[in-house]
Structures are given as C-alpha cells and as structure tokens.
Amino acid sequence: MFSLQDICRKHLFQLPDAFDEYILQALGLYWEKHGSLQRIRKDAVFVQRNLIISTNEALRIAASEGNERVINLLLSWEGNFHYVIIGALEGNRYDLIHKYGSQIKDYHMILSSIQNANTFEKCHELSNCDMWCLIDNAIKYNMLSILQKHRNFLTEELENQEFFETACEEQKYDIVLWIGQTLLLDEPKFIFDTAFKMVDFSLLTIGYSLLFDNKMDIQDDLTSLLTEHLEKAAAKGQLYFMLETLKHGGDVNFEVLSKAVENDHRKILDYFIRRQQCLSREDIENLLLSAITNCASKKTLNLLLSYLNYSIKNITEKIVQHVIKGGDYTIIILLKKKKINLVEPVLTGFIDQYYSYCFIENFIREFAIRPERLIKMAARKGKLNMIIEFLNEKYVHKDDLGTIFKLLKNLVCTMKHKKGKETLIILIHKIYQDIHLETKEKFKLLKFYVMHDATIQFLSMCKDCFNLAGFKPFVLECLDIAIKKNHPNMIQNIEILSKYE
C-alpha cells in the first residue's frame, strides 16, 4: 500500500509556499545541498524554486552524489535509470552500479547518453569488450579524445580503414579529419565515394583538404579523379559540389555536362553553358542529341534548343536518326511548334524499324496523321504485317472486312508507287478469300486486278469464277482493258484463258 508521502511525492506538481524545510524533508521533497525538489513537468524538475533541469540530469547528479533517497524519488518521476549508472560512474559510486546494473541488458545502450569521454570509457569497460569495440563506439558517438588517447593502438592500415569508413558514414567530421591527417589508410578516397553517395558537402571539403593540404596519397591520377568527381556531381545535380571541385582543378567539358543532360539537371547546364560559356556550338549540338537518346524532359530539350537559337540545320539528319533509334519523339513536338517539321522522315523511320502499332498510334494521334497516309507509307516499305496489325486494331469486328476491302481498293487507285500497290493488292486478295462477294462484285474485283496488272491475283480468282454465268464474255472485256492499259503479261494470260470453253 502506498503511503501518503509516496502519493504526494509522485503527484504533487505545485508546492505550497507554506511548506518549510522541515515539511519538505518529511515529504522526501528536499535535496540536501540543493534545496526543495518539485516535479513541474513529466520530464523536468524545479530545484529550490528557481532552477529548472531535466529529470534525467537531476538523476545523474544525485547518483554522482550517492543520494539514494533522491534517486528513488526521481525514478518514481519516470527518470531513466541509465542516468543512475552514468552518475554513479562519474562519482565512482560502484555500489549503485552493482545495485542497478542488473537492470542493464547491454551497457552499449547507455553510451549515446554520455557526454564525458572518461565516463564513456568507464561505461564501456563494464561491457567487457575489446579495444576495437571501444574505438568503434567512440567514432559512433563522436568521442575524438578517446581515439587520440589510444593513438598508439591504431597502427594497422586495414583496421584504420574500417574506422575511417565508419567515421565517414556516421558523418563524424572531426574524427574523419583527424584519422585522415594522423593514420595510415588503405583506401583514403573512400571519403569522396561517401560524400557523393550521401550528398555530404562537408565530407567533400574535408576530403579535398586532406588531399591537397595534407598530401593524402590516393594512388590515382589527380586530373582523372577530379573529372570523375565533376561527372558524379553533374549526374546528381550538385552544382556546389562541382564548384568546390573546380577550385582544385578539373574541367567542365562535354562528357561532364552529358551527365547533367542524362538526369535533367538544367541548373547545371544553364550555369556552365550560358553563364560560363564552357562549350562550343558543336558540343551543345551533341548534348542535344544525347538528351534525345536519354529521353530528356521538354524543359531540358527546350533549354538546349534555345542555346542553339533553334537552328538545327547541321544536325537535322542526326536528330531524326536519334529519334528513330530511341523512340522518343518529344523533340519533334517542340520543333514543330517552331515551324520545323520533321514528322515525315521520323514516321518513315518508325515504320522502317517496325515499331508496334500502339506506339505508331500515339505518334499519328499526336501529329494528326490520317490512317490512310500511314497505310500508304507502310505499303511502300512492304510492311504488310504492320498494315494488318493497324487494321485489326482500328477495325475490330468481322463485319468491318467489307469496309477495309473498299478502303484498300481506293488506296490502290490513288497510289503511284508500284511496290506499295502490290503490297495492298496482296492484302485485298487475302480479304477476298475471307468474305462473300456476289457475282457482280467478283467481276468488279477481277477488272480491278486487270487495271492494276495484278496477274497472280487475277488468275487465282479466275479459278473461283470459271463456272459463273457470263464469265467467258467478261474475260474478253478484261482483255480489252489489259490492251488499253498495256499490260503484256496480263494480256498473254487472258488470251490463254479465253481459249478454254
């Protein structure tokens, strides 16, 4: 059962002014050498009515003094018993450590709360770990003085390298600088890798300080290293990294800025191309081509075009080639708005490369290209499968075959390209074999074949029509058409056909 004093101590946040020292001592709210002790918040106490400190700080002080009565009071006020251990270590109160140590599963958990290096080392000794563990934790919690104290222990390059890497990754700058200046390292340039990985400007500047001021041996060509840094910074869009690197050497060239292009970092492009004028016109043209290849954003493409004043005569053909190869036609949209029309050569290239209909469909929708134009272009290239895929997507019902049939016949009649006509006629004949035509329509199709000198299709269809009424006189009509059109091969075949009864 709780006593009245316990209840008062735990829940009394406002001490009456009438409480004198005797009453406070009776309630257990008096701290010897300090005065009255009052809880004012969940995590803070009021000492002698004029000093506010955290509950844990009060607990640390009480433990260092060995005042168990105050310790118990503060623990009842939700103080962290870790601070009992810290205070006990500071005051060499090992009886308290023995009493409360059983509640500590791992003394490493306390290290983050310790500010004093000596106390830190004492606490670590309670863990019974080796020196490597102490050094590792000293780095983790920024205890440089511990590393300096045990400098003679740090003689192996590989172990030192591990500590250096830990310090870099933990961003403990003072320790990084001290290790770099003092110890032998296996891979000192690890600091730069970490700086770029974590985008840590402080690490970068420390790295250059070690490299140039302390002559850190990186066993690499400096020019190559600085160029590598510029490329990494450009790829990440870190302009300040680039400017810091340039203080020590290096050159911003096409290779460097191409990294910025690949990742759409326009601020870097604008700084070095417009303000610093680092590149020739030819280099800017090549950057534009690189941007096309890497599917750069409209803003990046527009920026590069603006540096060229939208004059692309020297690279028009290359632009078309890069668009066709990469498949991204954003640049074509931008150029068309500036009255530079490259739609035709690009569409021709897409057809040559046999891009999927889905891709082509988006392109023709973007540039409002009529389907008939696409079919004719594909026919001229002999892309029969592409035309079939296109028609299957556009006309999904079997009833649409008649519509397709008429469309293709009209296209043949308006085409001059011989190979294109042949491609479409092959498709027309395929459709004929899948639909039903009346006798009159069959004769019309035969005339169509004769007019366009489609001998193979004509003879194939004649086999189907041979027994139809009126076929023989119709063949003579076809002969007249072939003679008028001057199709020698067709004439010869019709003459042979007309001899059969």
Curated annotation (Swiss-Prot):
Keywords: Early protein. It comes from the Viruses. The keyword Transmembrane helix does not apply. The keyword Secreted does not apply. It holds the Pfam family DUF249. Induction: Expressed in the early phase of the viral replicative cycle. Plays a role in virus cell tropism, and may be required for efficient virus replication in macrophages. Belongs to the asfivirus MGF 505 family. This is Protein MGF 505-4R. It comes from African swine fever virus (isolate Warthog/Namibia/Wart80/1980) (ASFV). The lineage of its organism: Viruses, Varidnaviria, Bamfordvirae, Nucleocytoviricota, Pokkesviricetes.
